[in-house]
Amino acid sequence: MARDFKIMNFTDERAYHNTAILIYLKAVKSVFEHADVTIGNSLNQGYYSYINLGGRQLTTSDIHKIRDKMEKIIAHDTEIVIEHDTAKHAAEKWRSLGYPEKAELFAERPEDETVDIAELHNYRNCMYTVMLPSSGCVNLFDLRPYRNGLLLRLPNALHNHTIPKYRDDDKLYEAYAECRRMRKYTGISYLADINREIRNGNADEIIRQSEWLQSRQLEEFAEKIVEEHKKVVLIAGPSSSGKTTTAKRICAEIERLTGSDPLYLGTDDYFVERGMTPLGPDGKPDFEGLGAVDLELFNQQMEDLLAGKEVDIPEFDFVNGTKVFGKRITRLKKNQVLVIEGIHSLNDVLTENIPREDKFKIYISPLTQIAVDRHNRLSTADARLLRRMVRDNQFRGYNAEATLEAWPKVRAGESVNIFPYSSSADVVFNSSTVYETNMLKTFAEPLLKAIPESSGQYAEAQRILMFMKYFDKIEATDAVPDNAILREFIGPRK
């Protein structure tokens, strides 16, 4: 039965979320016929949404009406029909309905190309990827006011089909606000905008603008670190966020301001000896848990460094699974900043001997800047997955199938070791750029197409290909600077 549906994997999660958004859009349309709805970035286990009611503010009563309508749609368990249209007709229809960004996206496609339209009780919209068969499958959601809009909160694959406890995340919201300012500066809000610029030969200029904006933000962080006399900079974020490149660029900016090169180190060099690595629930070594770090040694060495003492920083030998000493004996110079990058950097247990006022915490993630249209956007998780897939193939010899197989375990580890500590950050850095998915497509598309139908990862590969087909390719160009975060994934200039 539909009401018994449960999210079992990330393909299910994406389908559930798309279906819930469709139900939400239908409900808003039913309650406020002429309202203009925008689905924003993912936030607090859900999606931030803004409803334009023609000048008046959204009220608690309005939200109750929308929630009640959603519950009725779900209880009715209406079939979601996938209709097929031509790109030409779809473009004409969306233009007549006042959705120019949807219309332009389809107008760019071959006229006779098939476009899928999701239909729910006479309401139609493009969701670009997988859907559940009926509205009754969405058996759990939460709708609550947030800032000038509301949050549609949903279960996911990592929390056993439950909605995690709500916690406000001001820093992440502020980072999304910065994304909106960047979009306004570049004039690129939707996918059709960047596709148009690519076709007009302006890709290099978009790359330069995006990289300049990102560099300016890193400069501001460095200025804040120096002005506030911070002694330790802690950088953390989920897989494929671009932590290593960001840490190096922060170091370069601090050196520019102070004339002193920060002391940079990664927590990976402080792993316990491999035989002492704790086991996870699956009985295999858990290299991502805090127990895999030699906390006693790390804290002692950080305390000694800040006291001006000489320290023998280890270098971890990943082949033999042991720390090697004697290669990096150093001490902090006067006013030299210590920059630490690693999974657990925002967890205060890692640096419990360092006073909070001496720390500057940076949470980094590729918060997606580009929206497909006002109702659809590339998720942050998918943005990171594309990065990881390309990097795994470029530098580690893994195919896309192997990356997809490993991804659930990676995300499960992040939900325990990284995301719970993101709200403790002083700043959130968005490591994505508006052009990156268009460029990553050049590398990722052939990898995904190579996954055979017999593979257990075939459905997930097809889901990604479904939405990625609307992104025009940017071939790797020299316009991407050597220190760009994207270079961490696509490789150096040739």
Enumerate the predicted regions with their spans:
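Conserved nucleotide-sensing/catalytic segment adjacent to the nucleotide-binding pocket
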Residues: L263-L265, V272-G321, V337
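Conserved NTP phosphate-binding and transfer environment spanning the P-loop NTPase/kinase superfamily
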Residues: T351-K494
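Auxiliary tRNA-acceptor-end handling modules of aminoacyl-tRNA synthetases
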Residues: A2-A15, A27, D36-R216, F221, ...
